[in-house]
Amino acid sequence: MMLSKKNSETLENFSEKLEVEGRSLWQDARRRFMHNRAAVASFIVLFLIALFVTVAPMLSQFTYFDTDWGMMSSAPDMASGHYFGTDSSGRDLLVRVAIGGRISLMVGIAAALVAVIVGTLYGSLSGYLGGKIDSVMMRLLEILNSFPFMFFVILLVTFFGQNILLIFVAIGMVSWLDMARIVRGQTLSLKRKEFIEAAQVGGVSTASIVIRHIVPNVLGVVVVYASLLVPSMILFESFLSFLGLGTQEPLSSWGALLSDGANSMEVSPWLLLFPAGFLVVTLFCFNFIGDGLRDALDPKDR
């Protein structure tokens, strides 16, 4: 009897160890994301780039506005401390690439935040309310989407001048449009679910249903699209700056540095290679992370 009792206790302990704990959606997504080597490696590289643009100007012996008149358009040199070289005005390129990276990343992340907040609320309300309200809201979206964006930017620059705030306004105006469409499509399928109908029967207000029930259930799609939107907005800001419609002196961004480097590419190729390298690597990292999040959060792959 003693032996059988010990055996039963051993079996119970062993079965408890073998018991598989249930995982939530986000725990399962994190596990799947960590198994994606390209996404994890991209996340690490992106973290290092963010660390570089934050810390490098603080550790450098040169400031953003310092000019070395004796080393104008100088090639990268370890002895002088100009590790990325200097531009035509003798300013340290490493510091300028780091400061420009701050602005480019800030624009991309800010555009993604605008898309997440405005696009999610607009799309979820449109999809949930349905009927004529949905039709009107979608027609308004189509009008905004068909508006020539470059013409809009030129008008802003003409009337208000060039500054970084206009870049945020201009890019924020278009970043949320596709997000609203995606969230609306998800909401149309969600509002027929039993838990939404139960909330309606229980007298829960429309605002509470949207914020407490619909928005949390579309966050997976929102996170994936936001991660893929950041590189698009960084590239768009770089394009505007390259055309001279974006950030201007004394501020700079990777796009503005590319524009300066392209003008002197034959005699000073480092002015183009360093900002272009950081821009390309950052865009690839965001895209790999977005692909990893999409694979991790896609319910079809479960």
Task: Map each language-model feature to its residues.
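Transmembrane alpha-helical segments of polytopic membrane transport and secretion proteins
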Residues: 1-44, 289-302
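Alpha-helical transmembrane segments of integral membrane proteins
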Residues: 88-302
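Membrane-interface helix starts
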Residues: 30, 34-47, 105-109, 266-273
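Short, strongly hydrophobic transmembrane alpha-helices
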Residues: 38-57, 120, 280
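Hydrophobic alpha-helical transmembrane segments of membrane transport/permease proteins
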Residues: 8-13, 52-88, 243-251
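Short, membrane-interfacial amphipathic segments enriched in basic
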Residues: 11-29, 79-92, 129, 207-208
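Residue-level signature of catalytic and energy-coupling elements of molecular machines
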Residues: 33, 51, 143
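Proline-centered turn/helix-capping motifs that create local helix->coil transitions or kinks
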Residues: 2, 59-63, 232-235
